Design a protein with these regions (language model features):
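TPR/TPR-like (Sel1-like) alpha-helical repeat modules
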Residues: 117-140, 147-154
Length: 164
C-alpha cells in the first residue's frame, strides 16, 4: 500500500466534499450573470418588463464590479427605451456613464440621444450624438448618428418657429 498516494486521495476527496458544503461565491456570481444574460435574451425576445426585472435582480450582486454594473444599467436603459419610459431610460444610461465617464461608449451616447429625441429634447439629443461619434462607432453608425443630428437640428428649428 502506497501511503502517500492514499493520503492524497483522502485529501482530494475531502476538498471535493468541502466545495459541495460551502459553495464558492463564483456559483453565486454565475447565478447573477445568468440573470443578466436572461435579461439580454428577454430584450431580444421583446419581453422588456421581464428583462428589466432580471437586470434589477442581477444589479445588487455586482456592486464591486464596475464593468458589470455598467452593462446592467445599459441593459436597463434599453429595456426602459422599448417600454417607452424615456426619462427612466436616460437616467439608467446616465448612471452607467457616471461610473467611468472616460470609458463611455458611443453606442450608449447614441441610445441616450435617441431617448432624448423621443422626449422632444432635441438639443440634448444633438449633444449626445455629437459626443458619440468619436467613441468607437462604426462607419455606418457614424453615418446614422450624423443623420440623427441633421434631423434633430431640423426639429429644433421647427420648435423655435412654434414657440414664437
Amino acid at each position: 500500500v502506497d501511503l502517500a498516494k492514499a493520503a492524497l486521495e483522502v485529501q482530494s476527496n475531502s476538498l471535493v466534499q468541502e466545495e459541495f458544503r460551502n459553495p464558492s461565491s463564483n456559483s453565486v456570481a454565475n447565478q447573477d450573470i445568468s440573470w443578466y444574460n436572461q435579461g439580454v435574451a428577454l430584450i431580444e425576445a421583446g419581453k422588456y418588463a421581464e428583462a428589466l426585472s432580471c437586470f434589477d435582480r442581477a444589479l445588487p450582486s455586482f456592486s464591486n464590479d464596475d464593468e458589470m454594473v455598467i452593462r446592467i444599467l445599459n441593459g436597463r436603459g434599453n429595456a426602459f427605451y422599448y417600454l417607452e419610459n424615456y426619462p427612466a431610460c436616460v437616467e439608467s444610461y446616465h448612471q452607467a456613464m457616471l461610473i467611468r465617464p472616460e470609458e463611455v461608449r458611443g453606442k450608449t451616447l447614441y441610445n441616450m440621444g435617441t431617448a432624448y429625441a423621443e422626449m422632444e429634447r432635441y438639443q440634448d439629443a444633438v449633444k449626445c450624438f455629437e459626443q458619440a461619434i468619436p467613441r468607437g462607432l462604426s462607419k455606418d453608425e457614424i453615418k446614422r448618428t450624423k443623420d440623427q443630428i441633421r434631423r434633430c437640428n431640423i426639429l429644433i428649428k421647427e420648435q423655435k418657429k412654434k414657440n414664437r
